[in-house]
C-alpha cells in the first residue's frame, strides 16, 4: 500500500504551487477579472441607495436617466470579466493537470520493477487519471470561487460598513463562528476524499481484471464472481460519496442558519431609535440586500471547501508516489557495444518483502558468443536469473560481471541497450506491426531492415496476407494476432536490434511444431557470435546449447551439455524422459 503523508492543507498547496507558478500570468489576469466581476455585482447593489433616496424619494429624473446606462455597462463588464476569468483559470488548470500527469507518468517509468510487483495496474491508472483530475479542483473551480466570492464578501462588507457600521458589527461577531464551522467540516471532507480515492483505485482494478480476463470469465463462468466483486467496490464508492454529500448537506444549512441569525439581529438592531435616526430607505435596503447577497458567496465558499479538500487529498496521494525512490542508476560506465562475456559469482537474491531467497549461491559463466540454457520446473528461478542480468532487480550477495565489470557500474540505459529480450509474455502496442518491430527505434531503421527482420522471424508469411501488411494496426497487446504470430513479432524485434546479448525466455513456447522448427533456424543464426541465455520448457530447443544448467529451487544442481547430462541420468534426464515419454 502507498503511504500518504498527512500534510496540512497549506503544506500540500505550498508544494503544489511550483507546478502552478509558471502560469502565474494567467492567474493574475484571471484574478483581476474575478475581482472586476465581483465588483460589478457589489456596485450594482450600491445603486439601490441613490435610486431609492434620490431617484424616487426626491424625484430626481437625472438619476433615472443615467441609471439604465450604468446597469448595462456593469452587465457588459460582468460578462466580459466572467469569460476572461473562466478561460484563464481553465487554461492554467489544464496546464497543471498535464504537467502533473507527465511528471507522474515519467516518475512511474523510472520506478523499479519491484514497485509494479506490489501495485495493481488499476490503482496506478486511477492515480494518473482520476487523482490527477482531482487536482484541477484546487487550481480551477475552487480558485474561481475563492477569489470571486472572497472579493464579493470583502466588497459587500466594505459597503455595509460605509453605510451603517453599527449594523455591520453584528456580522463581525458572527464571522469567527462561521470560520470554525468551515474548519471542522474541512477535516471531515479530507478524510472521506482519501477513502474515495482508494476505493476508485479498487473500482478501476476490478474493471481492468474483468476486461483483460474476459475470455477466462466466460469460459469458467465467472460472471457472478466478477459481478459481485465489482458491485462490492462500487457500493463502497457510493457509500463514500454519500458521506461526502451528507457532510456537505449538513454544512450548507449550518452556515445559512448562522447567517440567518445575523440577519435577524440586524433587523432587531435597526428598530432601535438611535440607529433608525441614521438610516434612510435606501441605506437599510442596501445593507439588508448586502447581507442577503452574502449568503451566496458564503454558501459557495462552504461548497468549494469539499472540492478543494478533494484536490488536496489527491495531491497528497500523488506526492506520496513522487516521493518514492526511483530505480537506482549510479553507474558511470557507458559502452557502445560489449563483447558479451557474462559471469555470476556466488549470487544470492531475494525478492523485495520476501525472506526466503529465490536464488542461492548461483555461479555461472557465459563466454562471448556462447549459448547457455536454463531448464527446470516452473518457479525454480530461471526467469529470475534473466531479470538480474538486465538489472530489473539488484542482488543482495555476490557479483554479476559483464566483460569483467560489475553490472552495477554500467549506466542502466547503456546496459539494457546491449540486451535483446524475447519472453513468453509478449507485450505488443496498439500500433502498426512495423512500429512494434522497430519499437523505440523507428527513426533508426529503414523499412527494408524492418521487413528483413520480419522475414528472418518467419513473420512475413502472415503479414503479407493482411490488407495493410506491415502497416496493419494490431490492437491492444496484439489482440488481432494469434499467440504464435505475436511471438514472431517479438522475435523480429529482437532480430532488428542486433544486440550482443540475447535472452530468450520461453521464446518459442507459443509456436506450433512447424513454426517452431522454422523460427529455430532463425534463432540459431541469430545466436551466432552472440552471448545467449535461453530459458526453455521444450528441451528439444536447447539440445545444441554449449552448456545447460538445471535449476531446482533456486540452486544449480546440474551443468553440462545435452549428452553429458543425459549420460548422468540425473534431474535433466528425468525431465527429458517426462517430456518425450522415453
UniProtKB/Swiss-Prot annotation:
It comes from the Bacteria. This is ATP-dependent lipid A-core flippase. Signal peptide: none annotated. The gene is msbA. SUPFAM superfamilies: ABC transporter transmembrane region, P-loop containing nucleoside triphosphate hydrolases. Residues 28-310 form the ABC transmembrane type-1 domain. The keyword Cell membrane applies. Keywords: ATP-binding, Cell inner membrane, Cell membrane, Lipid transport, Membrane, Nucleotide-binding, Translocase, Transmembrane, Transmembrane helix, Transport. Belongs to the ABC transporter superfamily. Lipid exporter (TC 3.A.1.106) family. Its EC number is 7.5.2.6. It is a multi-pass membrane protein. Homodimer. It is found in: Cell inner membrane. Coiled coil: none annotated.
Amino acid at each position: 500500500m502507498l503511504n500518504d503523508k498527512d500534510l496540512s492543507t497549506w503544506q500540500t498547496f505550498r508544494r503544489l504551487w511550483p507546478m502552478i507558478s509558471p502560469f502565474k500570468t494567467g492567474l493574475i489576469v484571471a484574478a483581476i477579472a474575478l475581482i472586476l466581476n465581483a465588483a460589478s455585482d457589489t456596485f450594482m447593489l450600491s445603486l439601490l441607495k441613490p435610486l431609492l433616496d434620490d431617484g424616487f424619494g426626491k424625484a430626481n429624473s437625472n438619476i433615472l436617466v443615467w441609471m439604465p446606462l450604468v446597469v448595462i455597462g456593469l452587465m457588459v463588464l460582468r460578462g466580459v470579466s466572467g469569460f476572461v476569468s473562466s478561460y484563464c483559470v481553465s487554461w492554467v488548470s489544464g496546464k497543471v493537470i498535464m504537467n502533473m500527469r507527465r511528471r507522474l507518468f515519467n516518475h512511474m517509468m523510472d520506478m523499479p520493477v519491484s514497485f509494479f510487483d506490489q501495485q495493481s495496474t488499476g490503482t496506478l491508472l486511477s492515480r494518473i487519471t482520476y487523482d490527477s483530475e482531482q487536482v484541477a479542483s484546487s487550481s480551477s473551480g475552487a480558485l474561481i470561487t475563492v477569489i470571486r466570492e472572497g472579493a464579493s464578501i470583502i466588497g459587500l462588507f466594505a459597503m455595509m460598513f460605509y453605510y451603517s457600521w453599527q449594523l455591520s458589527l453584528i456580522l463581525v461577531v458572527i464571522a469567527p463562528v462561521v470560520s470554525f464551522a468551515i474548519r471542522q467540516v474541512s477535516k471531515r471532507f479530507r478524510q472521506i476524499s482519501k477513502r474515495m480515492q482508494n476505493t476508485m483505485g479498487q473500482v478501476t482494478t476490478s474493471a481492468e481484471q474483468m476486461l483483460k480476463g474476459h475470455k477466462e470469465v466466460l469460459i469458467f463462468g465467472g460472471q457472478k464472481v466478477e459481478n459481485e466483486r465489482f458491485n462490492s467496490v462500487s457500493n463502497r464508492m457510493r457509500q463514500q460519496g454519500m458521506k461526502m454529500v451528507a457532510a456537505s448537506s449538513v454544512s450548507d444549512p449550518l452556515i445559512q442558519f448562522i447567517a440567518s441569525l445575523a440577519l435577524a439581529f440586524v433587523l432587531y438592531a435597526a428598530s432601535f431609535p438611535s440607529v433608525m435616526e441614521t438610516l434612510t430607505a435606501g441605506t437599510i435596503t442596501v445593507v439588508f440586500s448586502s447581507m442577503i447577497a452574502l449568503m451566496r458567496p458564503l454558501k459557495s465558499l462552504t461548497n468549494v471547501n469539499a472540492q478543494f479538500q478533494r484536490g488536496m487529498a489527491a495531491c497528497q496521494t500523488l506526492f506520496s508516489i513522487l516521493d518514492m525512490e526511483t530505480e537506482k542508476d549510479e553507474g558511470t560506465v557507458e559502452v557502445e557495444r560489449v563483447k558479451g562475456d557474462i559471469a555470476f559469482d556466488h549470487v544470492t537474491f531475494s525478492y523485495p518483502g520476501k525472506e526466503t531467497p529465490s536464488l542461492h549461491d548461483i555461479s555461472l559463466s557465459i563466454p562471448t558468443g556462447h549459448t547457455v540454457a536454463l531448464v527446470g520446473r516452473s518457479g525454480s528461478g530461471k526467469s529470475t536469473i534473466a531479470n538480474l542480468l538486465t538489472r530489473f532487480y539488484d542482488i543482495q550477495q555476490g557479483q554479476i560481471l559483464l566483460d569483467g565489470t560489475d553490472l552495477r557500474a554500467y549506466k542502466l540505459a547503456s546496459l539494457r541497450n546491449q540486451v535483446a529480450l524475447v519472453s513468453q509474455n509478449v507485450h505488443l502496442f496498439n500500433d502498426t506491426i512495423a512500429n512494434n518491430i522497430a519499437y523505440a527505434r523507428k527513426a533508426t531503421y529503414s523499412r527494408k531492415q524492418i521487413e528483413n527482420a520480419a522475414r528472418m522471424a518467419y513473420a512475413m508469411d502472415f503479414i503479407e496476407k493482411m490488407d495493410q501488411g506491415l502497416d496493419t494496426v494490431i490492437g491492444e497487446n496484439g489482440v488481432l494476432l494469434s499467440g504464435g504470430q505475436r511471438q514472431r513479432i517479438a522475435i523480429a524485434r529482437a532480430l532488428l536490434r542486433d544486440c550482443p546479448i540475447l535472452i530468450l525466455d520461453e521464446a518459442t513456447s507459443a509456436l506450433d511444431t512447424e513454426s517452431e522448427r522454422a523460427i529455430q533456424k532463425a534463432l540459431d543464426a541469430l545466436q551466432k557470435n552472440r552471448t545467449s541465455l535461453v530459458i526453455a520448457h521444450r528441451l528439444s530447443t536447447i539440445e545444441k546449447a554449449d552448456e545447460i544448467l538445471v535449476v531446482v529451487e533456486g540452486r544449480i544442481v546440474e551443468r553440462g551439455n545435452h549428452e553429458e547430462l543425459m549420460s548422468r541420468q540425473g534431474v535433466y534426464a528425468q525431465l527429458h524422459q517426462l517430456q518425450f515419454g522415453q
